[in-house]
Amino acid sequence: MPLTRDFKETIQQRARRDGRFREALLKEAVDALLAGDLDTGKIVLRDYINATVGFEKLGSATKRSPKSLMRMLGPRGNPQARNFFEIVAYLQKKEGVRLKVRAV
């Protein structure tokens, strides 16, 4: 289900001013992907990118076109693990966090 523009704007505004919220968004995206929920993970990751670095800057950092990154994380996108982890590594560095995977 697509999010309404007002909701996306609310997410972006909060992410711009709240570092813990940004960290939680990034963690939520990775958690969803690791749990096998690719669709939710991609949606949350796109929202995170749009609210923080943007696809232009991410494209420059990863040497990929912003449109390619948007397609990769779009509804029909299927990112390769190498691309996904390169994106996550850059976002962690940019955010100043280090996510860890733990068995529960």
Where are these regions (language model features)?
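N-terminal flexible/basic segments that precede or flank functional cores
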Residues: 1-44
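Short C-terminal boundary/hinge segments that cap the last helix of small helical domains
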Residues: 93-104
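Recognition helix of helix-turn-helix/homeodomain-like DNA-binding domains
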Residues: 63-79
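Short, basic-rich loop-to-helix N-cap that marks the start of a DNA-contacting helix
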Residues: 76-89, 100
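Short alpha-helix boundary/capping elements
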Residues: 33-34, 49-53, 95
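Signal for well-folded cores of large energy- and translation-related assemblies
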Residues: 16, 34, 74, 89-92
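Alpha-helix N-cap/helix-initiation sites
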Residues: 19-23, 38, 55, 59-62, ...
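Short basic helix-loop element that most often maps to the first helix and adjoining turn
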Residues: 42-58
